[in-house]
Amino acid sequence: MKPPARALAGNLIWSADGGVWALWRVRPFAHAYCTTTERLAVHARLRGLLIGLPEQSMLLSVCERVEPWDVAADMADGVDLGEHQAWAEACRMTVTALTGQDLYRRRHYLAVELPGERRRAPWRRALRTAALDVVSTLGLAPAGVDQAEIASSRRQAQRLQVGLAQHIALEPVTTGEIRWLYARALRRGGQEPAFDQSWKPPRPARHDGAGGLLAPLVDAVVKEGGYRDDPDRPRHRRYVRIDSGRESTYATYLVVGDMPHQFTFPDGGGEWLTHLDDVGVPIDWCVRVRSIPNSEAQAKLRRQHRQLIGQVDEYDGEVSGAPPSLAEAITAIDDQRANLTANPAEPELQATTILSIADRDLDALEDRAEAITALFEPHDYGIFRPTGGQLALLRSMLPGTTTAPVCRDYTQFLLPGDLAAGAPYCGADLGDPCGLLLGFRVDTGTPTPVLLDPTYGPSVGRTASLAAVGALGSGKSYFLKRLCWDTIARGGQVVTIDRTAIGEYVTFADTTPGRCQVIRLSADSDVCLDPLRCFAGDERITVTLGFLSLLAGCSGRSEEGAALAEAVHHIAADSARLGDVIDHLHHAGDSTTRPDPAARSLARRLDHYRRLGPGRLAFGDGDPVQLDADFLVFWAPHLALADRDTLINEHLARQMLPEEILGHALIYLVAAVSRRVVFSNPTRFGAALYDEAWVLLASPYGQRLVLEGIRDGRKHNGAIWLASQHPNDLGAGELVDLLGTRLVFRQSHGAIDPATEFLGVAGSDDATEILRRGLPTGRCLLRDVRDRLGLVDIIPPISDAARQAADTTPTQQPTRSVTAQVDTSRPPQASDRTPPGSARTPTPQPPGPRRRRRTPLANVLDDTTGPT
């Protein structure tokens, strides 16, 4: 195949067809589950981008194949695999589990032809193209590009980028990425190459032609319509056969030939480019755009309007009159003229949308093409496969090429607002660039890995703290245990409180890597959690006051609160114990000179808690516990606790039993100790996990403790992880606003509105419908730290022991995972979901033999975990 370019320099392409193109990578907008207001805001930005495009441009989106080694490399990023053997083994096992699976993610690009090239004489462009063909036929390298032309083109591209970047985030691509785009176009459906650093040119770029850079990449035989002996060859040969190396693949190209005459945005028949993911197969798409200036477009429309008006008179003799289509055409032109007149800066866009799919099997390729047609036909979109124009469409999807003549037969005449309603560059990625493999996104048609880095939030100006809410048995605790295991394996530290009688986190601790420590909170425990001995500085006063105030039930503004504060400050000045505060209150209350009734009352109440069995944890004489393990579990199996309704109701709270009051105060004290442990070493990431967080958040002291932890976590390399059954358990104030990652699992119908508000998409019909239909166990709506939302299936831990320990579902036989709706041996497929209005999805073909790609990570893992 003829190389599409004669020279490359950074993100600049000197086209073999003449002209110079610039190519940028585009950061897409969030789209799924967004509210109408958010979508209209994105539409306005896309419209501004399209208005600013030069005469020739291309909007391109490709489905990049993700290799297992690439996922493992992202998992290992920032982790010393030699020191953390458990994570090295997890990476290796992940590669094994993903081998043979087809994983994809979208990349979006914008290519524009630099305007100056179009002003050159057409004969000069034609002569250059002919000369390049002769040079290529003789096997010679094409002529180089002089430095002056390169510098001039770069300045032009930079000026264009400055203007376009006001509407969308752009990043210039590298020469290696351009080479990869050209190479993958001829290898899709087979041994599709993955993008990595190996695509960088093998020698320093001297801008002396791209023959040596591109010729090997496009070294393939492309046959329009294939050959007679192609298996399952259809009657209408609307495909191309590509023979590259030792394999043969098939590709077909479809174009959008008809569109609805009218549609509304959003959710009114538009957004056709985002709906391509509903088919369930990897689809590349591009929109070839020619921008016509406003004045020129208006002149053309006036001529067309006169011609159509003249046709009306031709039907004067007809009894039925002019056909309705003629009146519709006149109305459409009137509307177009009115819009162009009202917006003099708005051009007319002549757009051709091309879709591309590929497969090893020709019969499967035909099924996929039929699925695309079946999805769009009911909505008045005409999808066509030009016979004899497949090769031209293939070349038209390569950046830096001119639009093929066949594209003109399927041109749609649109305004920028109309094309923006198609939602190009919408559908952002989900998750973090690196971290643990959390699961797979299941609302994008093709399985997409979702990574979660517990430490990523501060790098983008957000907190690392997160929260998960879900009904009983929805999978939120399973997710937290998965997060614990991976965080510890990556070198972090986690502290949690286990209130269950069966000790679910105690059992889980035995499966975690590193060293674990279980601290049982009971009357016979020999540990001491005295805040005056466990804390230092002002923190020991704050925590002591909070703990004793919860026990005494006094307010900081009352006389008792003032007396308690005086006693704590007096005792904290010396190396004292918590019991000394009660003794000081007794002394103040029984003073012969100035007895303090408030102090006497406080001393009597607190003395009772000192004598209670669990009270020895705070008032006892044991040694302070050493909290330096990788995973610390405070186990309180028999701690008496009031329910949430009692805690938030003032009347019921006054009727709490002493054991319940003490239990609630001890939970606060343990949470404070956990926070101190997590924030003690800024060089090591730590997290304090509070499952069933309503117990802690029901009191103002607990809320303040958690809020301070979320605020300070970014500075101390720590995080607070919260989980509860109802979104309202977390409140609706600044605590929720400051959270980073948020997850919503299955919810009851009454909790749907609070759940969407918790996710920040209140009013989103899509999110409401997803939650209303119900989520299977282990599936959740995830909002990442960059405010992108998606539907994710959480996968189980890679360790068999951790998988069984994390699952608390009562069963007579061990279960494989809590995500019962998902086969853990493979990523979720498009057939696992049935979105409203989606077309049938063809059964995916089993993957063919895959070539194992050796990477630097593979060599490291071989050294750390043995041969794979």
Predicted features along the sequence, with ranges:
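Extended, compositionally biased
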Residues: 54-118
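N-terminal-proximal low-complexity accessory segments that begin disordered
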Residues: 1-67
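Surface-exposed, low-hydrophobicity interaction/linker segments
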Residues: 75-81, 261-345
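P-loop NTPase motor core of the ASCE superfamily
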Residues: 97-98, 466, 537-583, 730-852, ...
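Conserved P-loop NTPase motor cores
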Residues: 448, 454-474, 478-486, 495-504, ...
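An aromatic-glycine-centered, glycine-rich loop/turn in mixed alpha/beta architecture
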Residues: 1-6, 20, 37-45, 53-55, ...
